[in-house]
Structures are given as structure tokens and as C-alpha cells.
Amino acid sequence: MVRRLIIGISGASGFQYGVKALELLRAQDIETHLVVSKGAEMARASETAYARDEVYALADFVHPIGNIGACIASGTFKTDGMLVAPCSMRTLASVVHGFGDNLLTRAADVVLKERRRLVLMVRETPLNLAHLDNMKRVTEMGGVVFPPVPAMYRKPQTADDIVAHSVAHALSLFGIDTPDSAEWQGMAD
């Protein structure tokens, strides 16, 4: 079976996380299925210099957010799972409560029901009780809550270094190794 990963980009700040995932997966020759929310399109335009077509060209397949009949909306379409990078609190809440009202949340619902890996790079601070409850619930459902917290021990030099390490770590949860996912070797004596 070809390795396939669904990449969801939702409307939280941090559109770059989704782009970096697509870049790293292209280098690994893993088939990517991209779905981008309307809020994510707004974040792309306000936070980055990326053109929409430039981002979409990184994916093997791009599915419109409203296409509930897309292949990734069915459990019979085999994937390694789904990475939502970044994941807004609205998307998290929709996944937890089973609202498959758009293709991003429907695909996440399918990944959970098929017992595949769902990794949510949640982006919000500070967190309120509803956020924390939803994170707990999605974890109980089998999802992985993965806030993209900078790994300062790696001594990042740029924002891209921080993004690359977080995304590489998230991809390692799918068994995908990238050059940015080097193992921690411990502290020097």
C-alpha cells in the first residue's frame, strides 16, 4: 500500500506548520491529501507570503473544504492517518463532538472511527476549561494533542527551525522520519 497522509490546515495562527508538513512529506515521497479551511485561507493571506496555488502545489491531492463526498471522507480509503497543522479550537471542538460539517472535520472523524492516527497541532494560549476538556476528550477518543511547543534545547536560529522541528516530531508519530527528527542524545556530562 502506498503511504498516504491527510493534512488538514485549520484557521488557527500558524499556517506555516501545515506548509512545512507538506514540504517534508514531499521529500519522503508520501502521498498527501490536503484540505484547507476558510479560516486557514485567511491566516495564509495575513500571516504568510505564500500564494494559495504555491501551497496547493505541494500536495498530491487538494480537496475542497465543502466536498463531503471526497475519498478522504470514507474509511475504505486507506491512509496512515491525519495531521491537522495548525488545529484551531473550533476544529478541535468539532472533532470531539462528531460534527463532520466540513471535509476537514469529517476526515478527522473517519480517522478516529477507523482507529488510525490523528495528530492535532493545537494553537491557542491561554487555554480555557472548554479547550482543556476537549483536549482530554479527543485524547480519550484516540487522538494525539500536539501543541507545537518550541524545543529550545535544539538552539533554533530561525522561526523556520522551530516550525521544522515541531512538524518533524509530529510526523514521527506516524513513523515518518525526516532530517529534522533527530533523536535526543542526552546532555553532555
Swiss-Prot record:
GO terms for molecular function: carboxy-lyase activity; flavin prenyltransferase activity. Keywords: Flavoprotein, FMN, Prenyltransferase, Transferase. FMN binds at G11, A12, S13, S37, S88, M89, R90, T91, R123. InterPro entries: Flavin_trans-like (IPR036551), Flavoprotein (IPR003382), UbiX-like (IPR004507). The keyword Transferase applies. It is an enzyme of class 2 (transferase). It catalyses: dimethylallyl phosphate + FMNH2 = prenylated FMNH2 + phosphate. Its EC number is 2.5.1.129. Dimethylallyl phosphate binds at Y153. Belongs to the UbiX/PAD1 family. Flavin prenyltransferase that catalyzes the synthesis of the prenylated FMN cofactor (prenyl-FMN) for 4-hydroxy-3-polyprenylbenzoic acid decarboxylase UbiD. The prenyltransferase is metal-independent and links a dimethylallyl moiety from dimethylallyl monophosphate (DMAP) to the flavin N5 and C6 atoms of FMN. HAMAP family: ubiX_pad. This is Flavin prenyltransferase UbiX. It comes from Neisseria meningitidis serogroup A / serotype 4A (strain DSM 15465 / Z2491).
